[in-house]
Amino acid sequence: MGRGTGELGRAERLPVLFLFLLSLFCPALCEQIRYRIPEEMPKGSVVGNLATDLGFSVQELPTRKLRVSSEKPYFTVSAESGELLVSSRLDREEICGKKPACALEFEAVAENPLNFYHVNVEIEDINDHTPKFTQNSFELQISESAQPGTRFILEVAEDADIGLNSLQKYKLSLNPSFSLIIKEKQDGSKYPELALEKTLDREQQSYHRLVLTALDGGNPPLSGTTELRIQVTDANDNPPVFNRDVYRVSLRENVPPGTTVLQVSATDQDEGINSEITYSFYRTGQIFSLNSKSGEITTQKKLDFEETKEYSMVVEGRDGGGLVAQCTVEINIQDENDNSPEVTFHSLLEMILENAVPGTLIALIKIHDQDSGENGEVNCQLQGEVPFKIISSSKNSYKLVTDGTLDREQTPEYNVTITATDRGKPPLSSSISVILHIRDVNDNAPVFHQASYLVSVPENNPPGASIAQVCASDLDLGLNGQVSYSIMASDLEPLALASYVSMSAQSGVVFAQRAFDYEQLRTFELTLQARDQGSPALSANVSLRVLVGDRNDNAPRVLYPALGPDGSALFDMVPRAAEPGYLVTKVVAVDADSGHNAWLSYHVLHASEPGLFSLGLRTGEVRTARALGDRDAARQRLLVAVRDGGQPPLSATATLHLVFADSLQEVLPDITDRPVPSDPQAELQFYLVVALALISVLFLLAVILAIALRLRRSSSPAAWSCFQPGLCVKSGPVVPPNYSEGTLPYSYNLCVAHTGKTEFNFLKCSEQLSSEQDILCGDSSGALFPLCNSSESTSHPELQAPPNTDWRFSQAQRPGTSGSQNGDDTGTWPNNQFDTEMLQAMILASASEAADGSSTLGGGAGTMGLSARYGPQFTLQHVPDYRQNVYIPGSNATLTNAAGKRDGKAPAGGNGNKKKSGKKEKK
């Protein structure tokens, strides 16, 4: 079979690739691929391998997702091979009509990256249509008087094919009276005319039947036939004659129905009824109407240039005798700008990434205007200020691409309006709008609402309580804007961080894992991070400083005097002759809190003799308020309370035992009668003390024996005289509880003589000793502790002399309140430096005071009767100076210079004191 019988599978397919380079500013290379195929190819037929022609490999096809974008689905692309396949019937006559060239243009779309490729498939005509007449038979009346050579226009056949496959010629069945003449119109179409070869005789043959055949130029040619019936009429000498054989006129397509197109006119030289001419269309017209009397042709319907550009009609003029004349009327329709351009989007991206680079392809725009000429020339523009632009890709085809940076956080979507305007007069335009949504990318890091955070948390907070909350916002969407919180770093120990704080990843709330202690941890800093869930994730850090607020959770601690298990201190001795204002002792306390919570005040809760003593509210100094009366008891008891400034205040109490006496002998009964405080670990300590005592006794016996043997050999009698009966004191230092552990920021360790456990050994000194001779008992530090006094003292071994005024403190050197002392109570210490060893020895020696005239309380020049007293009250902000913790008991004694001056007054002699004591003994 030939091409006309459907051998479409073997038709040639000639793919031709054309590459059209756009300007350098075009972001992509636009390729146009041309194919040529015959019409009526069966579905599934291969047009060509589109992937190969585009340079795609088979491996790329799954990712590139090559597909066809067109208004009608004539073609499709195989996802496996990339071949362009026929998907619907291709009828050239239906698609293009009588156009000499028929091509289907569409776009091939490839993704990753997105690009468009123009494809042109030319549809070749095949001889699949036969010429057809509108009717199977036609009737024609010819007068017997018609002269040979007279021509009659016959019905034309229609062939939908073009070119050689269209109608090419006509054939007429053989008849000696008629012949066939073929003529051609201006558009190239052919029509037949019947020519009379000889005169007809109606009396011989009144009816003729002829067969008219129309043939195309196909191979083999196709044909169509119609029967021509000729009726011979009676003679009419003069037939009608038209003014012109062909009437041509141009008509605008926008004329309304009823518009007069033209008027045909014919004349007949006959008279009477034979000269009356009536006009009619040779073929029935539907668009135009003809006035049979006047020959006026008018429009019957609205004309449309886009449907039919030209009309050709045959008008007959028939006289009353039956003679007929024919003329041709050709009406050319002029195009008017009556069609607005049509704008359509193809392969529009639903979402555009906000980080798309300028020039990213968004959509393909197709412009179509049914008008022709300038009326069909269209200009496309983008309305408004948007970060997009349109680029001409081919005729009536544009690309919509990005023309700037996109930011979804500022503009999440764009309403893009594209206007197409033709060049008609007046120009027509149409617009189409589309909303382009911007897809979010993780381009915004979380931002904290504050540059840094500072919170205050009171101590002793409940574990698990929230102490702070941070908040960060992320302008992105979805996971890109979902923020989680964590602790990145801190100034705490890494291992201890988890035991202090934790953080909620969702809410940003920071929780305390434990109760904070202001005395252990006053402040700490955390580095918090907010991180989104994007890929890659973005984060931001912020510092959170936590200040632990102090609460009054620590009661004052009494450091001095050292308290026993029952809360009472050992006795302090006050001279009977003490004047009002005499400094008896000083209560020293500290508070581990700070601020007002550590501001201590001292109060007397109970006194055995009210009004006898006064207590400094802030200094804690216990002074005599008046002189001792005859009715006043020698032993006094003061219950002192130390309160802090917290709300509510916390307090501690201390019981002071004060004894008015001038010598230790007066208070010995009180000392021996006083019960020894019980020790919780007395049993264990007892065994330890016994063991140590045995070892010490054995060692001392060995040393004494060695010294005695050596002195036996010595010739110095003075050395032996020291071992004569006299006064020797053995005392053991007692260390109060250690306050270095706990919540105090500073440690206070005191070493004082525990007078309750002091032992006295009375030895009789040798009378051979000179009054100026003293035994030096001490270490290399130079501290002098005389055990044997001058001969003057031996005359009254049982008397206690009052302390020497040379050892009294000056007003400027008295201990006072730290931090907030009055100007008159503030003084500086002497410039001479005391070694640590000397002070320790002085403190230990203060517990050993002689009971007779040779005791350290006498008025001898070498006397150093010392008792440890803690210095001024200290708060947590001051570190105590150990030099302030020593003063002379029994009086306001102060260390003086060699001249013995104290505050501008001459010191009282020691001998006078001794005489006064002697008088008391005599009484």
Swiss-Prot record:
- Source species, domain of life: Eukaryota
Q: Which Pfam families match?
A: Cadherin, Cadherin_2, Cadherin_C_2, Cadherin_tail
Compositionally biased spans, kind Polar residues: 807-832
Tell me the residue ranges located in the Cytoplasmic compartment per UniProt.
709-923
Q: How does it sit in the membrane?
A: Single-pass type I membrane protein
Task: From the record, give the transmembrane residue ranges.
Answer: 688-708
- The protein's name: Protocadherin gamma-B5
Cell compartments where the protein resides:
Cell membrane
Record's GO cellular component terms:
plasma membrane
Location of the Cadherin domain: 31-133, 134-242, 243-343, 344-448, 449-558, 566-671
Q: SMART domains of this UniProt entry?
A: CA
**Which residue ranges are recorded for the region named Disordered?**
794-832, 893-923
Q: Where is the composition biased (Basic residues)?
A: 913-923
UniProt keyword annotations, A-Z? Calcium, Cell adhesion, Cell membrane, Glycoprotein, Membrane, Repeat, Signal, Transmembrane, Transmembrane helix
Q: What does this protein do?
A: Potential calcium-dependent cell-adhesion protein. May be involved in the establishment and maintenance of specific neuronal connections in the brain.
Q: Which residues form the signal peptide?
A: 1-30
- GO BP term, pick one: cell adhesion
Q: Which organism is it from?
A: Pan troglodytes (Chimpanzee)
Q: Which InterPro entries match?
A: Cadherin-like_dom, Cadherin-like_sf, Cadherin_C, Cadherin_CBD, Cadherin_CS, Cadherin_N, Protocadherin/Cadherin-CA
Extracellular topological domain residue ranges? 31-687
The residues that the database entry marks as glycosylated are N415, N541
Q: Which GO terms describe its molecular function?
A: calcium ion binding
